[in-house]
């Protein structure tokens, strides 16, 4: 979702929670190594600005050395204006890259009017990011997905795709070239939204294409918000569930086979 609910506590409390959650994620899933060069995918939304700002703060005091390479992709969506983002990056200083690839025209040419754009658009954007990381000598790609993104993705796949999957905090790409990390994985969207407002980041519109996938995600986000009003700490509990999978208590025979689970096997005779 583009906006978050009000975050508890003042700006300092929000900042401390975000720093703590980011640090815990980096350590728990071993996201960074000494000497890493990290491409930070900067969309112009509150999440990626927050990610870059927190990593900027962490870098001078971290026990390892790593570089940050902000990278923004202009996908030529209608109504796009990236000038505020570029000015912000110039004021920040240091290396950054803004590149233009007209993926919007590719998607609209290949799909019928009214079709869902997000899947094809995401694949095209992912390929461009992977190639950019390799070309720029980056060893990691950092994305701004947070806790609520992971939970919304879980429910989207459950409700609309019939699959039990979400997004992992870290993964190696299928081609083996890139390691993708999500340092905000433990961060609440409401905290990120509050932090972004306090920092007055120049936010770019988050859904210029008006895709149906984006509307479904907003609907699922509202569902989670409504449920948490009735079930305290629901999202924290759901996130914990993503780290405590019990394959033998599910019904995926292929997964059973890979893990050597055979419920039909009789116990050995005494």
Model features per residue range: what roles?
Residues 27, 33, 37, 159-181, ...:
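Flexible helical/loop "lid" subdomain adjacent to adenine-nucleotide binding pockets
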Residues 1-155, 160-164, 190-198, 249, ...:
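ATP-dependent adenylation/nucleotidyltransferase module used to activate substrates
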Residues 75-76, 186, 211:
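Short, surface-exposed acidic/glycine-rich loop or hinge patches that mediate macromolecular interfaces
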Residues 181-184, 193:
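Conserved core of the sugar-phosphate nucleotidyltransferase
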